[in-house]
Swiss-Prot record:
Protein name as annotated: Small ribosomal subunit protein uS2
GO cellular component, one term: cytosolic small ribosomal subunit
SUPFAM superfamilies cross-referenced by the UniProt entry: Ribosomal protein S2 (SSF52313)
Organism: Geobacter sulfurreducens (strain ATCC 51573 / DSM 12127 / PCA)
Family: Belongs to the universal ribosomal protein uS2 family.
Length: 251
């Protein structure tokens, strides 16, 4: 299990919240105090709640479910994209399209269009078009890739969302709640924790804090996926042994 230590949290600045004048009173239970007009997050609670979130994400992956990493603010884009790819999951790190979950059938049509364009450029069939047409198709492809590239392989709705800054991703969270999809989120002192199923109190603005927490969630996915693979492999071996015994008995 990938534990998170108080030292890691402190070094990444996870304990720094927002200015005291910019806060959500619902975050009071997660606040240790204030220093120089900045709220300090209670890292003991962060450690405990992080473990709950980690266990859920691991179990979600072990059950064969997928997770969608969401973080469109500039500080989160790289970590969200890179860590999702590292653990073989999906991500949205540019712009959340309204209906990305609640109208997934329509979004999937755009994904299919992107895949067709990719194939045209890969197999050379784009050469059948004029230079002007090919340029227009390339622009369309780039636009679709920017928004949908991170969910190109997502054939169905995810089993969970991991979100950086719920205040910035209200539409994504609202859609997840409508569909009953659990949400894990890094929640800063200016956020409303109520819609979040697994709250991780922490700094959602510092790049190091975002990277640390996102990478740990990716570790949880990897751990769960590996456990699932091990079980499936054991099951396959047992099935093969049973089949071999049956054929031996028949002989």
């Amino acid at each position: 299990m990938s534990n998170i230590t108080m030292k890691e949290l402190l070094e990444a600045g996870v304990h720094f919240g927002h200015q005291t004048k910019r806060w959500n009173p619902k975050m009071k239970p997660y606040i240790f105090g204030a220093r120089n007009g900045i709220y300090i997050i209670d890292l003991q609670k962060t450690v405990r709640l992080f473990k709950n979130a980690y266990n859920f994400v691991r179990e979600n992956a072990q059950a064969g479910e997928t997770m969608l990493f969401v973080g469109t603010k500039k500080q989160a884009q790289d970590a969200i994209g890179e860590e999702a790819v590292r653990c073989g999951m999906y991500f949205v790190n540019q712009r959340w399209l309204g209906g990305m979950l609640t109208n997934f059938v329509t979004v999937k049509q755009s994904i299919d269009r992107l895949k067709r364009l990719d194939a045209m450029f890969a197999d050379g069939s784009i050469e059948a078009y004029t230079k002007k047409e090919a340029l227009q198709l390339e622009k369309e492809r780039e636009k679709l890739e920017k928004i949908l590239g991170g969910i190109k392989g997502m054939g169905k709705l995810p089993g969970a969302l991991f979100v950086i800054d719920p205040k910035n991703e209200t539409i994504a969270i609202s859609e997840a709640k409508k569909l009953g999809i659990p949400v894990v989120a890094v929640v800063d002192t200016n956020c409303d924790p109520d819609p979040i199923d697994y709250v991780i109190p922490g700094n959602d603005d510092a790049i190091r804090a975002i990277r640390l927490l996102t990478s740990k969630m990716a570790d949880a996915v990897i751990e769960g996926s590996q456990a699932r693979d091990a079980v499936l492999q054991t099951g396959d071996e047992e099935a093969m042994e049973a089949a071999a015994e049956e054929s031996g008995a028949e002989a």
